[in-house]
Curated annotation (Swiss-Prot):
Probably involved in neuronal development. It is found in: Nucleus. Residues 425-437 have a biased composition (Polar residues). It comes from the Eukaryota. This is Coiled-coil domain-containing protein 174.
């Protein structure tokens, strides 16, 4: 049986589906053809392909790639910051090498002496320039010496011949003949540019035309002023084309309100920064002054200590202290000879670590009775020679009457520790009549009455009250 004549078992629904699919394909073909004719290309068809085993990635590859990208970004940021820091340091170093310091006090913070480096660099440049000039002069002399004495032969090409000419400024020039036309053209252009000035350009306009231009400019400014909202009138609004120069202290603010406020804020911020820097500078100066004064005070203390050890304490105090001096014992006079009988001298040694003029008391000497003499001080010659105009005010000595009384006394030792059998007790403990006499000699200055002490404790308590 022939296959072509064999009937096909096809249902009606399948035939309808086939016709519908055929019709849809025909319509798609017609649409594509129309789009091609009109010049519009349709979207390419997307083909859904199954991913192959080669396109499949390993687990965690994308995460590692993201981490690497983040790490590269962080490294790039760190590198950019380091580059910015290095550029800032390079600019700062370049400024310092040129001598442009931010502040004079900042110069002391650095270990490098940039001022000396600038001086050395200039000296080196001057030396190298002088050496180079001397070398050039030597080479020029050598070339002149090596030139032949004969005449220089003329050039083979006449265009290479040297010619002299005078430019528009009256200067004598020398060039090759082939370059002469170009140089003359340049000179002509330069001469024309020099003689055309802004003043000459203004003269090209008549007075009426200039007034008309000014009127038009004024009208434009008035229109802009009408468009702006009502507000305060500033100097820049009425200045117009003023030719007066207002100096470096004048700042031209903008006419726009927002821009003007921004400029004023910036100017205020700069003023505050300047004030803060000035205050910091003053504080630094005060700290340095305080440190210097503390050092000087330490040096004075050391000097006083050395002078006390060397026995020149009184001279240093007279030179340093201003005002009323505390009572201090002066040079001990020679003891007067006792008329009644021989007496034992009691020498009191002063410790260097105690107050001057007050002897040190040992623990086993407290409460003992000694026949010490009395203090008698006389007025210092320096104070006597002093001009009353330069003396301290009298109010300083209101509560120091006893001090002045005791300052005119000197220490003497008239009595022994124990009296002789033939001597009266009042003579051994009391002063002699010649010492207690309040009537001074006609030639000697008046002396104050004496003060006697029975015990060492009485004497110390008295001098504590006095000093």
């Amino acid at each position: 049986m022939d296959r072509r004549k064999k009937p096909l078992d096809v249902t009606a629904s399948s035939l309808v589906d086939l016709k519908a699919e055929l019709f849809r394909k025909q319509e798609e073909f017609k649409q594509e053809k129309l789009l091609k004719d009109s010049g519009v290309f349709g979207k390419p068809k997307t083909t859904n392909k199954k991913p192959s085993i080669w396109s499949k990635q390993n687990v965690g590859v994308s995460n590692r790639a993201e981490k690497d990208a983040e790490q590269k970004i962080e490294e790039q940021k760190t590198l950019d910051k380091a580059r910015e820091k290095l550029e800032e340091k390079a600019k700062l170093y370049e400024k310092m090498t040129k001598g442009d310091f931010i502040d004079e006090e900042v110069e002391d913070m650095y270990l490098v002496d940039f001022t000396q480096k600038i001086i050395d660099k200039r000296k080196e440049m001057e030396a190298s320039g002088a050496h180079r000039d001397s070398q050039k002069a030597g080479e020029r002399d050598d070339d002149e010496e090596n030139l032949p004495e004969g005449e220089i032969p003329p050039p083979q090409d006449p265009s290479e011949e040297w010619v002299d000419y005078v430019d528009s400024l009256g200067r004598s020039r020398r060039c090759m003949r082939k370059d002469l036309p170009d140089l003359l053209e340049m000179d002509k252009n330069l001469q024309g540019r020099l003689f055309i000035s802004p003043a000459n350009e203004k003269t090209l306009l008549s007075e009426d035309m200039r007034k008309e231009l000014q009127r038009q400019q004024w009208e434009e400014e008035e229109r802009e002023a009408l468009k702006r909202p009502m507000g305060p009138v500033h100097y820049e609004d009425i200045r117009e084309n003023e030719a007066r120069q207002l100096g470096v202290g004048y700042f031209a603010f903008a006419r726009d309100k927002e821009l003007r406020n921004k400029q004023m804020k910036t100017l205020e911020m700069l003023r505050e920064q300047t004030t803060d820097q000035r205050t910091k500078r003053e504080n630094i100066k005060e700290k340095r002054k305080a440190i210097l004064e503390a050092r000087l005070a330490k040096l004075r203390q050391k000097k006083m200590k050395k002078s006390k050890e060397g026995g020149t304490e009184e001279e240093n105090r007279d030179g340093d202290v201003i005002g009323p001096l505390p009572p201090e014992p002066e040079a001990v006079p020679t003891p007067r000879p006792a008329a009644q009988s021989s007496k034992v001298e009691v020498i009191v040694q002063e410790r260097k670590d105690t107050k001057p003029g007050v002897p040190h008391i040992r623990e086993w000497d407290r409460g003992k009775e000694f026949s010490f003499g009395y203090w008698s001080k006389r007025q210092s010659d320096l104070r006597a020679e002093r001009d009353p105009e330069f003396a301290p005010p009298s109010d300083y000595f209101v509560g120091q009457k006893r001090t002045g009384f005791s300052s005119s006394q000197a220490w003497s030792r008239p009595g022994p520790a124990q009296s002789d059998p033939g001597q009266c007790p009042d003579q051994s403990h009391g002063p002699s009549p010649e010492h207690t006499s309040p009537t001074p000699a006609p030639d000697n200055p008046p002396q104050a009455p004496t003060v006697t002490f029975k015990t060492l404790d009485d004497m110390i308590s008295y001098y504590k009250q006095v000093t």
